[in-house]
Design a protein with these regions (language model features):
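Short helix-capping segments at alpha-helix termini
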Residues: 25-30, 113-115
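Glycosyltransferases and closely related glycan-assembly transferases
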Residues: 83-96, 105-119
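Structural detector of well-ordered beta-strand residues that form the stable sheet scaffold
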Residues: 4, 34, 96-97, 119
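Active-site-proximal region of nucleotide-activated glycan assembly enzymes
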Residues: 113-131
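Conserved nucleotide-sugar phosphate-binding/catalytic loop shared by glycosyltransferases and other
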Residues: 2-10, 30-83
Length: 131
Protein backbone atom coordinates (compact mmCIF):
# COMPACT_ATOMS: atom_id res chain seq x y z
CA UNK A 1 0.00 0.00 0.00
CA UNK A 2 1.34 3.45 -0.98
CA UNK A 3 0.22 6.42 1.10
CA UNK A 4 0.94 10.12 0.67
CA UNK A 5 0.63 12.28 3.77
CA UNK A 6 0.81 16.05 3.47
CA UNK A 7 0.66 18.82 6.01
CA UNK A 8 3.03 21.44 7.17
CA UNK A 9 4.13 24.79 8.34
CA UNK A 10 3.50 24.26 12.03
CA UNK A 11 3.64 21.47 14.56
CA UNK A 12 -0.16 21.56 14.67
CA UNK A 13 -0.19 20.05 11.19
CA UNK A 14 2.97 17.96 11.37
CA UNK A 15 2.53 16.04 14.62
CA UNK A 16 -1.01 14.82 13.84
CA UNK A 17 0.37 13.61 10.49
CA UNK A 18 3.19 11.76 12.24
CA UNK A 19 0.70 10.17 14.64
CA UNK A 20 -1.41 8.95 11.71
CA UNK A 21 1.71 7.61 9.99
CA UNK A 22 2.81 5.68 13.08
CA UNK A 23 -0.67 4.16 13.46
CA UNK A 24 -0.61 3.07 9.81
CA UNK A 25 2.87 1.59 10.21
CA UNK A 26 1.74 -0.45 13.22
CA UNK A 27 -1.23 -1.88 11.33
CA UNK A 28 0.46 -2.17 7.94
CA UNK A 29 4.25 -2.49 8.37
CA UNK A 30 4.81 -2.90 4.62
CA UNK A 31 3.08 0.39 3.76
CA UNK A 32 5.19 2.81 1.72
CA UNK A 33 4.66 6.31 3.03
CA UNK A 34 5.69 9.55 1.38
CA UNK A 35 5.42 12.82 3.30
CA UNK A 36 5.00 15.95 1.19
CA UNK A 37 5.67 19.31 2.82
CA UNK A 38 7.30 22.65 2.12
CA UNK A 39 11.05 23.27 2.06
CA UNK A 40 10.77 26.07 4.62
CA UNK A 41 8.34 24.67 7.20
CA UNK A 42 9.21 22.72 10.32
CA UNK A 43 8.41 19.52 8.45
CA UNK A 44 11.55 19.88 6.33
CA UNK A 45 13.60 19.17 9.48
CA UNK A 46 11.25 17.03 11.57
CA UNK A 47 10.01 14.50 9.01
CA UNK A 48 13.42 13.29 7.71
CA UNK A 49 14.64 12.99 11.33
CA UNK A 50 11.71 10.62 11.88
CA UNK A 51 13.11 8.37 9.14
CA UNK A 52 10.37 9.11 6.62
CA UNK A 53 10.67 9.82 2.92
CA UNK A 54 10.13 13.54 2.35
CA UNK A 55 9.54 15.62 -0.77
CA UNK A 56 9.19 19.39 -0.70
CA UNK A 57 6.80 21.47 -2.77
CA UNK A 58 7.55 25.19 -2.84
CA UNK A 59 4.39 27.04 -1.88
CA UNK A 60 3.33 29.91 0.36
CA UNK A 61 -0.05 30.93 1.70
CA UNK A 62 -1.99 33.89 0.44
CA UNK A 63 -2.15 37.18 2.27
CA UNK A 64 -5.64 37.95 3.55
CA UNK A 65 -5.84 41.19 1.56
CA UNK A 66 -5.42 42.24 -2.07
CA UNK A 67 -1.76 42.56 -2.98
CA UNK A 68 0.67 42.07 -5.84
CA UNK A 69 2.38 39.42 -3.72
CA UNK A 70 -0.78 37.31 -4.03
CA UNK A 71 -0.38 37.33 -7.83
CA UNK A 72 3.08 35.83 -7.42
CA UNK A 73 1.79 33.35 -4.87
CA UNK A 74 -1.02 32.34 -7.23
CA UNK A 75 1.61 31.49 -9.85
CA UNK A 76 3.52 29.45 -7.26
CA UNK A 77 0.27 27.65 -6.41
CA UNK A 78 -0.25 26.70 -10.06
CA UNK A 79 3.33 25.37 -10.19
CA UNK A 80 2.75 23.52 -6.91
CA UNK A 81 -0.29 21.73 -8.35
CA UNK A 82 1.77 20.71 -11.39
CA UNK A 83 4.55 19.42 -9.12
CA UNK A 84 1.98 17.63 -6.94
CA UNK A 85 0.52 15.92 -10.00
CA UNK A 86 4.01 14.67 -10.87
CA UNK A 87 4.51 13.37 -7.34
CA UNK A 88 1.16 11.56 -7.36
CA UNK A 89 1.82 10.13 -10.82
CA UNK A 90 5.28 8.88 -9.79
CA UNK A 91 4.35 7.45 -6.39
CA UNK A 92 0.99 5.85 -7.33
CA UNK A 93 -0.66 6.29 -3.92
CA UNK A 94 -3.61 4.20 -2.84
CA UNK A 95 -4.73 7.06 -0.60
CA UNK A 96 -3.69 10.65 0.18
CA UNK A 97 -4.11 12.20 3.62
CA UNK A 98 -3.94 15.93 4.38
CA UNK A 99 -3.56 17.39 7.85
CA UNK A 100 -3.63 21.07 6.92
CA UNK A 101 -1.25 23.77 5.90
CA UNK A 102 -1.08 25.21 2.41
CA UNK A 103 0.94 22.34 0.99
CA UNK A 104 -1.87 19.84 1.60
CA UNK A 105 -4.14 21.60 -0.92
CA UNK A 106 -2.19 20.88 -4.12
CA UNK A 107 -1.41 17.33 -3.03
CA UNK A 108 -5.03 16.46 -2.25
CA UNK A 109 -6.22 18.18 -5.44
CA UNK A 110 -3.70 16.26 -7.54
CA UNK A 111 -4.64 12.98 -5.86
CA UNK A 112 -8.34 13.65 -6.35
CA UNK A 113 -7.83 14.49 -10.04
CA UNK A 114 -5.97 11.18 -10.40
CA UNK A 115 -8.87 9.27 -8.83
CA UNK A 116 -7.00 8.60 -5.58
CA UNK A 117 -9.20 8.60 -2.45
CA UNK A 118 -8.39 11.51 -0.15
CA UNK A 119 -8.85 12.13 3.56
CA UNK A 120 -8.64 15.40 5.48
CA UNK A 121 -7.81 15.32 9.17
CA UNK A 122 -8.83 18.56 10.90
CA UNK A 123 -8.03 18.86 14.59
CA UNK A 124 -9.22 22.43 15.08
CA UNK A 125 -12.72 23.52 16.10
CA UNK A 126 -12.79 25.78 13.02
CA UNK A 127 -11.27 24.46 9.81
CA UNK A 128 -8.30 26.31 8.38
CA UNK A 129 -8.25 27.98 4.97
CA UNK A 130 -6.87 24.95 3.09
CA UNK A 131 -9.12 22.36 4.74
Amino acid sequence: MNIIVSGGGTGGHIYPALTIIRAIQRREPSARILYVGTPHGLEADIVPREGLNFIAVDLAGFERHLSFENVLRAWRAVRAVARARGIVHGFHPDIAIGTGGYVAGPILLAASLAGVPTLVQEQNAVAGVTN
